[in-house]
Amino acid sequence: MAFEERIGQGGHILFWQPEDKFRINSKQILGMDLDWTIIKPIRGKIHPIDENDCEFIVKDTEISRIKHKIDNGYKFVIFTNQGGLLDADKNKSDKKMGLIGFKNRWVNIYKKLQEEHNIHSVYLIVSLYNDFNRKPCTGMWEFMEFQLNDNIKVQKDKSFYVGDMAGRKGDHSSGDLLFALNVGTQFQVPEVFYSDSKLSSNFTSVLIKDVYKNDKIFNGAKYIKEFDKNISRSNKKITDDITNILLDANTNNKQYLVLFIGK
């Protein structure tokens, strides 16, 4: 059980799978964010300072909700943006956890899930760069579905994604909500998932209104700029044009219709 990396057209993926006997392929996915959805720093900071700085965000009885889903046939996959790890490795003086610390921390988390909660079947997918794998872009989900699920078609309407960044007041982004919307799956925030509360029919609609009210609108221009590094020169003018449109729309509150036609 070691971390693996893939570099493809959509960018860079870091991922981890359990040993063979615990691997599951399923039509139904329980996707979750990692930080502040499953774990949090012990010392009260927003970001962990080392590999030992984490604890589960809820009590044991609530963590058992994850095992219940796995026992009912769900594939449990964690999708996490970790763009700060490489910056931390470059700036050692910042006292932030780097990539090696993150990997060691994950080993500690998985060991606790196994020993304390009897949860063995866990997949971890990590985005390290501002490319098409970074949430709310859908690259990590697509990698899971087409590379780690034996080509089984996922029933997105029966799957769901749980994350804390929902565009609410106090959330620093709406990335988790928008990730679920882009994927086309159901969305829950951690406090709803762990309490097994019934969702109102307009739950997502209310959150979307909060995204605009709290100015948590996603700016996709930086993702396309990052992706520019990996595309051919013949396609660069196209992405430059799209980037300018996104910047104009985001800055000046304009609306554009962009059609992408494949062949």
Regions found by a protein language model. Give the residues of each.
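Conserved Lys-Pro-Asp/Glu-containing loop-to-beta segment of HAD-superfamily phosphomonoesterases
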Residues: 136-174, 257
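Short catalytic/ligand-binding loop motif for oxyanion handling, primarily in non-cytosolic enzymes
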Residues: 85-89, 132-134, 168-170, 196-197
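Alpha-helical substrate-recognition element adjacent to the catalytic core
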Residues: 2-131, 252-263
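Hydrophobic helix-cap positions at the C-terminus of alpha-helices
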Residues: 66-69, 113, 144, 148, ...
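Short, surface-exposed alpha-helical segments at coil->helix boundaries
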Residues: 100-107, 138, 174-177
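Residues at the starts of beta-strands that form the adenosine-phosphate
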Residues: 73-76, 158, 186
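Acidic, Mg2+-coordinating phosphoryl-transfer loop and its flanking beta/alpha structural elements
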Residues: 160-203
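Non-catalytic pre-domain segments flanking phosphatase-related domains
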Residues: 1-34, 42, 194-252, 257
